[in-house]
Amino acid sequence: MADKLYQIKLDIKKGKNIVGSDGSVCSPYLRVTWGGKKQQKTKVITKSAEPEWNFSCLLEIKKEKNPQKPGLEFELIEHKQFSEKEISSTTYQLPESLILGEACNYSVPMSIATSKGDQKCEILIAITAINFGKDKQDEEKKRHDEIQKKFAQLVEQLATDSKAREGMMKLPYEARAQLVEQHRDKLANEKHPDEYVVLLIKEITRKNIQLAGGLQKSHSASNASLGSLSPVTPRVDDGLSVAELKNISVALRSRGLDWIHQFHKLGATTRLVELLSLYVNKKSHTEESLQKQLECLNCIKNLMNNNVGIGYIFGIKDSFKTIVLCLGSEYEKVNELAIGLLNTICFLPKINGHKLLIELLNYFKEEKKESRRFISIVKSLKSKAGVIETKETLKTKSIYLSFINIIVNTPAEIDLRLALRQEFYWLGIKEILVKLSNYTYDESPELDTQITVFEEEESKDNKEMSERFQEFKGLNLDNVDDVLKTLMDRIRPKGLVDCMREISKDLLLLPIDDDVGIRNWVLASRIIKQISLRDKNIGIDEDILPLENLLLMCEQEAKEVPLKSQIESLKKDAQDLAKKITTQDIELKEKVEIIKKNEELTTKQLEEQINIAKKKDEEINQLKALVEQLKLTQGTAKPDSAAASTSVAPPPPPPPMTGGGAPPPPPPPPPMTGGGGPPPPPPPPPMTGGGPPPPPPPPPMTGGGPPPPPPPPGGGPPPPPPPPGAKAGGPPPPPPPFGKGPPPPPGGFGMKKAAAPPRKEVPVPALKMKGLQWVSLNDKKIQGTIFSKFNLDTSKDINLDYKDIEGVFAAKVIEKKESTAPKKTGPVSIIDPKTSQNLSIFLSQFKGKSYDDICGAISKGDETVFQPNHIDALIGFLPSEDDINNINEFLREEKDITKLGPPEQFSMKIHSVPQVKARLQAMKFKYAYESKKSDLKVDIDNFKQGTQEIKGSEKIPKLLEVILILGNFINGGTARGNAYGFKLNTITKLADTKSTDNKLSLVNYLTRVVIKDFPHLNSFAQDLGHVEAAGRVSLSQVQAEVATLRKEFVQVQKSIETLNSGTGEEAVDPFKVKYEEFCTQTAEDIDLITSSSQQIETDYKDLLAMFGEDSKSEPSEFFGMFTKFMDQYDKATKENEQLSIQAEKIAKREAAKKLKEEEDAKKKQLAEERKQKGETVEVKESVVDDLLDTIASGDAFKNRRRRARKTDQDSTIEPIDL
């Protein structure tokens, strides 16, 4: 019966990725039938996506009915509480490779249709053929033969020489089978290199035909109107697929050197680069074409993973130009691989890889029409708006940044590194790195590593650059005067002053007003920098800096110069605005305090008035009670009225006041007969001080003012005048009338000065003469000069020929001719020529303003017409008395003011303004006052706030106590230990105490203690916001400035008081009214500033005493100690944070490094075990991969500073011919 059946044993082991129809985990079981016979089913596994059935059954069918052995039918059932549902089914054909009596494992694929889409799953089974199948011995023999064949192929691929080949052929069968299994990928691809060459040539031909067809198509379109037929494009197949390119890449990675050599010898390497060029230069790219670019690059990378392949790639002309054009691809994988290949050329031996890389990037800029070199690389680092970065995108950015690090940090010359880094600064790399630094190490270890490399290399270069100026110790490089002085001192002994003068003269001729001029200045700066850093010519060595690129850099920097100027201007405006706001805040606080004080005072006064009113009410009540009592008393007594009248004597006169004054005047005479009025009361006694009675009124003003009013009737005669020379303390006599000088000295009243000696009379010329321009002196000015000695006697021998002089110096008489040309006349200049020229230049600033407008503005105090510097200039240009006299003398002769020059005309105008100098001085003070007041108030407020912040801080004392205990422990057992306190400057010396390894200071340790045990003290610096500003204030300077301001104000105040009142239509001088109001407000301000400056000095001395400091300590020293300590504390806190972060990063890197070392050790151990067994171990080259790993870890840059630059910079790798 068994001979008529096919029998198999089926083991259903488990399922994978099984879900229900709704896409969630279900409770499945499986039904299976073979040839339509009895169904077998497994048990139900509750809620499992990977149910383990472990079910076995025997299946059989009749050979007669099923000669072809049908497939196994599987049904996957979803079991539910009240229903069952088939969720998938399939038929699995029995494999032809079944071996009689041997179990073979298989996987049955299935698909489940869910509400969320199709779900792939599989069933793991084992089939044992019981009475049919292949013979085991026959199959083992076939397998043995196959392994021997494949091993022979493997020997050809792996054995590089005859010795290695001989060693491999001695391996036993088991080792050979193991090697074949290990190199299955290599053996699976059995194509010969010539097959791939054919594929590459076909693809290149197809692309060229497509390109030619496109040209023909466009040509035919242009001729369509002529009715010509377009040529037929030859039919080509679909071309090289992505899968076929992948096969080439796999072959290049897995095959041996003989295969690679044969591949190159057949021209496939050249075809590969040519094909990549066709893909790159395509105008538009599809997803498939981009994938083909990637696979071409993978092929090149696998070729370059060994030194032989590197030689092949370098031997192809423009191979790397093709690779560099892959940059900027829409597919980031292409960019990453292209960058990786370009990065490696900087580390290859025997070539100047960096120079080649810079040349390639210059070529890329020209081909892609970029405005700036490297701009596309920097743009790729920027995050797109609204796009959230993932770990993959951050890794991509780390590759771009590694490329920048290679470009900038590979050269051995610091000047080249600085120049290249500066290019990236201008492209905005610093701002981008600041944003990228926000991502943590865990989010992207690769990006964090590259940012660290960039910053560390930048810091080291800056330090190295600063060492170049070590010979100029103490030189302030930011001060141009100091730099120029040092330069002159340096070149003078060498005789280079002439060269410096020529350079300076040329610089003097450079324009500065337009963009071209600014660009020239920047270019000159860059060229001199290049000369100072290099001994090569600009633009010759492109590895240093091409001249064209230097010009582009200068153009960009020139554009930034006006922007920097605008930024500085805006900063200054912002500072002025902030200063103004601060001043207003201070004044607001002052006014609030005044209001509070007034409110308190008003409340106090009201209380006093209420108390006084209460007392008066009580007194009135008492008086009323007394009156009532007196009325009762008068009612009982009846005295005689006459007796009463005689008994009451008049009150005695009041005693004279102390002070020894004059006795009171006698009592007035009795009243006249008929006078009904009572006698007037006696006059009051004289006031304390005993001064004489007031003096008589002054004589009336010139012009006849009304006499003073008579004394009131009945008041007695006026008091007598004081005796001459009385000094009893009375008021001083009134001043003389305004405009009158003091009386002449005794004996000199009405006397005249000595007259000038008689002079020789000089006749007046009959003709108009050419004038002699001189400044004449009148008789008053020659007193005591040599001119006072000239008289009739000294001049009697001077007899000039006046007729001859008249003929020689007579003004030329020009006959009037009929002419339309205007008559040219020159203005007369009397003032000193230099002063006149400066005044003319100054007046030209007042465009559209007449001299009357200017002088009227001065007269009325109109500040809108002037700038602050105008007032100073006007004071300097005020005409002297001699100038006015000379101008007046000219006008007496000429009678025409229009003949005078503008400076002379203006001088006459401004001289006519009453008390012009006093007005200008007042305006000058007012212009400067607001700025001075603001500066003083800000300084005083900062000082006050700083003092109060330290004095009122609760954290400072506790912090000092911590420092005291910490210091006592460190100094324990020494003379400095067991201290009760310390000088305040100790807090600035904590940073000088270093740890045992010199990596940390006592400040670092203090911050750790504070953060751990006293976290509330960590923010102590936030409470000391004004301390730094207070340290910049000099108390002595503030006091001096307050005194100077008060002195200037008093002078202005006096000058305003002496101004005349208005005359004519204006009864009041508007200038005086305006400035009197200003003086009133200013007086209050200055009083407040004075009192505040005195108060802060008192508070400061109290603060010094509080900390045990010398009372003479300067604020800059005292507050500076706190400022320095705060800076050190803040720096130490950040250092601790950075050290903590860095330690964490190092720990993670070490863990990753250790893991990699363990994996490498396992591989090495495995290789060693195989070697001991007699197996030949292939050591696979991976030049590119190893270099990329080194760059990604940052190790590639660590030894750059120790490497000497190769002297042979023009050598290249020679193509290798095998």
UniProtKB/Swiss-Prot annotation:
Residues 139-539 form the GBD/FH3 domain. This is Formin-A. One of its GO terms (biological process) is negative regulation of bleb assembly. Residues 634-762, 1153-1179, 1198-1218 are annotated as: Disordered. Residues 759-1155 form the FH2 domain. The DAD domain regulates activation via by an autoinhibitory interaction with the GBD/FH3 domain. This autoinhibition is released upon competitive binding of an activated GTPase. The release of DAD allows the FH2 domain to then nucleate and elongate nonbranched actin filaments. Interacts (via GBD/FH3 domain) with activated Rho-GTPases. Residues 1174-1209 form the DAD domain. Keywords: Actin-binding, Coiled coil. Formins play an important role in the nucleation of actin and the formation of linear actin filaments. InterPro entries: ARM-like, ARM-type_fold, C2_dom, C2_domain_sf, DAD_dom, FH2_Formin, FH2_Formin_sf, FH3_dom. Residues 1-108 form the C2 domain.
